[in-house]
């Protein structure tokens, strides 16, 4: 479990995160959303130990995340970054996935097994002997995900991992993330269509926590989405248009609207 308590972070004199309090349960998937500058990526960097908070604290399994405890906690946390290119140094896919395992003194037989297991999981097992630099952006992100999964962390953070990908590559990466189980998953994204599939959505605005709630609750409030410049999933836009203009369309039956919302919501989750 991750417990964030009164977390504040300053960059120079500027507060980037302001008194955050939130809890992320084990084996849950949360999406962090908010417009640019809301503090999403800063929070991610603090969680993996790349930055230290100015005030407050983070507890991971009741252990304070600080410089002293970082060697103990770092193996529990993996992160896939926004731009996959800078993570690679001309290795083959096989070598890249094995790289972290070799640095952790894992035996050769186990390395071979894990490389195959996670390459197959992310559908790059036919590319194991290909130089990573020859891959597409989506394939590189799948290699990055396999490399993190092979380390078997308890927490994985995905920081805008589809933002540089074409629509097809983004969809493939999103589908892979949805298959990962028995871990804390944190996806930082602008894509509410994708965030809607997570267990909870955390909304940040100007460094402040606005809400932490199941997606269904968030999307029931069009005014809230409008206030924080969040676009609803495309599959729910019809519901909002009808809700906004229900008197003109002579839809008086609230239960009909609720049924429509439920149908569209289930459609979104199954996509």
Curated annotation (Swiss-Prot):
Main location: membrane
E.C. numbers: 7.-.-.-
Membrane topology qualifier: Peripheral membrane protein
Protein name as it appears in the record: Energy-coupling factor transporter ATP-binding protein EcfA
Record family assignment: Belongs to the ABC transporter superfamily. Energy-coupling factor EcfA family.
UniProt organism field: Onion yellows phytoplasma (strain OY-M)
Superkingdom of source: Bacteria
Pfam families per the UniProt record, alphabetical: ABC_tran
Assembly: Forms a stable energy-coupling factor (ECF) transporter complex composed of 2 membrane-embedded substrate-binding proteins (S component), 2 ATP-binding proteins (A component) and 2 transmembrane proteins (T component).
């Amino acid at each position: 479990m991750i417990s964030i308590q009164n977390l504040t972070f300053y960059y120079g004199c500027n507060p980037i995160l302001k008194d955050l309090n939130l809890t992320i349960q084990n084996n849950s998937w949360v999406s962090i959303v908010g417009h640019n500058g809301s503090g999403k990526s800063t929070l991610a960097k603090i969680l993996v130990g790349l930055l230290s908070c100015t005030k407050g604290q983070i507890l991971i399994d009741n252990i304070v995340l600080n410089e002293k405890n970082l060697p103990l906690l770092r193996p529990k946390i993996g992160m896939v970054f926004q731009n996959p290119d800078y993570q690679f140094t001309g290795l083959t896919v096989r070598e890249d996935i094995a790289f972290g395992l070799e640095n952790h003194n894992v035996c050769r037989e186990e390395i071979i097994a894990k490389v195959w297991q996670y390459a197959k999981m992310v559908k790059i097992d036919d590319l194991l002997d290909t130089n990573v630099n020859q891959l597409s952006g989506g394939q590189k992100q799948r290699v990055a995900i396999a490399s993190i999964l092979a380390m078997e962390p308890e927490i994985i953070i995905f920081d805008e991992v589809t933002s540089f990908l074409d629509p097809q590559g983004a969809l493939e990466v999103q589908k892979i993330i949805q298959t990962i189980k028995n871990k804390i998953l944190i996806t930082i994204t602008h894509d509410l269509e994708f965030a809607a599939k997570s267990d909870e959505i955390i909304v940040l605005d100007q460094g402040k926590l606005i809400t932490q709630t199941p997606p269904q609750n968030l999307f029931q409030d069009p005014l809230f989405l409008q206030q924080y410049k969040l676009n609803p999933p495309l599959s729910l836009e019809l519901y909002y248009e009808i809700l906004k203009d229900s008197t003109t369309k002579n839809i008086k039956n609230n239960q009909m609207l609720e049924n429509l919302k439920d149908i569209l919501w289930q459609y979104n989750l199954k996509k």
